[in-house]
Amino acid sequence: LLTHTYTGYPMVKEARHRVLNGDLGKIRRIYVEYPQGWLYNDCAATNKQAAWRVDPKRSGKAGCMGDIGTHAFNLAEYITGLKATEICGELQTFVPDRLLDDDGAALIRYEGGARGVLMASQIAVGCENSLKIRVFGEKGGLEWRQEEPNTLILRWPDRPAEIVRTNNGYVSGISAYNSRVPA
């Protein structure tokens, strides 16, 4: 069982609303990245969580992409409403003797012609939980970062960027409904 918790954030719901409402126009590009640095070395002997995550007998056949890449992939499909039709991926293991991938990237083709790039890494030294997505359409773009979850940035060709904050009068009903921050 896998829970995709990032789709529950109010500003993720706001991003989805803006895309599905057509605010960005037809989606052209999706960039989603999920760098973490906690597995940058061979820490399995001293870290219980690392020990099971890098052991295919306990965690399964997928390493980094199965652990965190799936969240990035889900976030892109959720926000845009687009399904991936083709994926060209590369998995890499940088830490010597590690049995599972600890880094990966993918080029993604989505229905409707949109293209995407996904990066997931657990050897990105200095990064904690840096999930970030940028979506670009014909009329505008957006950016959301998990490390600053109450902020959504909207970008336009003809006016300044907008910073949308959780539970304000200008957010969509679905975003406001999912907010637990006092107004």
Regions found by a protein language model. Name each.
Residues 49, 53, 78, 105, ...:
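C-terminal glycine/acidic-rich active-site capping loop/insertion
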Residues 3, 33, 136:
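Alpha/beta-hydrolase-fold catalytic nucleophile elbow
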Residues 71, 78-140, 149-150:
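Glycine-rich, aromatic-lined ligand/substrate-binding cores of catalytic
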